[in-house]
From Swiss-Prot:
It holds the Pfam family D-Glu_cyclase. This is Putative hydro-lyase Mflv_5194. Its EC number is 4.2.1.-. It comes from the Bacteria. NCBIfam families: PRK05463.1. Belongs to the D-glutamate cyclase family. Keywords: Lyase. It comes from Mycolicibacterium gilvum (strain PYR-GCK) (Mycobacterium gilvum (strain PYR-GCK)). GO terms for molecular function: lyase activity. HAMAP family: Hydro_lyase.
Amino acid sequence: MNPDVNAISPAEARRRFRDGLVTPTAGWSAGYAQANLIAVPRDYAFDLMLFAQRNPKPCPVLDVLEPGQYAGPLLAGGDIRTDIPAYRIYVDGELVTEVADATEYWTDDLVAFLIGCSFSFEAALLDSGVPVRHIEEDVNVPMYRTDRPCRSAGRIGGPLVVSMRPLPPEQVADAVRITSRYPSVHGTPVHVGDPAGLGIAHLSAPDYGDAVTIRPGEIPVFWACGVTPQAAVMQSRPPLAIGHAPGHMLITDLRDSELVVP
């Protein structure tokens, strides 16, 4: 990880992505919250909002934009269609392409949801000496589809997706304590230990992102992940949906400290 990206402003990060830089965003703009994007047609927006309300761990909503709107208070002067490093375009639930600029696919009917991202609490983990392996190895965080169904809402339903960070056993409690103060970006882990408990067969083969090294004696710790709405879109098959490429987030102007609860 280039240490310079840790210190740049969210606006500068978004400018670089707008100019065509494609990279995972873990470790970027320390101190600022990152967000997942999922945009669906207005006709599906209520179902998606209800899905998020019923599944707050994987889908903590930071903001919802008006139909067709592509700017908002979390990205001053920004453009949601261009300021994320990479986007996934879904048609009838099928992933049809991944692009660095979603402008040509955006319609006046799309409603954009910005969902909290666990990258937002990683600076707090690192500040407390808790390792974050994908940052150490300069790769994307590993993410997995589980066999746990989310609560459905109208036409929207699908499996829970989780991110994984391996930790020494003596630091698991610290990670739980630290992340418990960030409920708006997934909060505490949903599972600790045996991945089979989530229906995950092989940690070395994530469904999204990259595999990371798990050292002898370390325990895999799983957090709910904001890719969950994209898994629901693939199952629910709306005519069009646009999401961030997993691990390639919107870096917002919202400070991590504003998300901390006592």
